[in-house]
Amino acid sequence: MPKLKTRKAAAKRFRATGTGKIVRRKAGKSHLLEHKSSDKKRSMSKTTLVHERDELNVRLMLPYL
């Protein structure tokens, strides 16, 4: 059976934790930051878990994750 290809765009955006959960970065921290509060910018810097409904799609894009 041939090797499965990895979606490179997804590989740059997601990673797996030690327990096998998938984490992502939060959106909205690239520009237009002047009017956002420090608390909001700080919370957007943290990573968060991928929702369980989306996790299957991410795992299909990343077969060797």
Curated annotation (Swiss-Prot):
Q: Which GO terms describe its molecular function?
A: structural constituent of ribosome
* Keyword NAD annotated: no
Cellular component, GO annotation: cytosolic large ribosomal subunit
According to its UniProt entry, one GO biological process term is:
translation
Pfam families found in the cross-reference section: Ribosomal_L35p
UniProt-listed InterPro entries:
Ribosomal_bL35, Ribosomal_bL35-like, Ribosomal_bL35_CS, Ribosomal_bL35_sf
The entry assigns this protein to a family as follows: Belongs to the bacterial ribosomal protein bL35 family.
Q: Which NCBIfam families match?
A: rpmI_bact
What protein am I looking at?
A: Large ribosomal subunit protein bL35
**Which organism encodes this protein?**
Nostoc punctiforme (strain ATCC 29133 / PCC 73102)
Name of the gene: rpmI
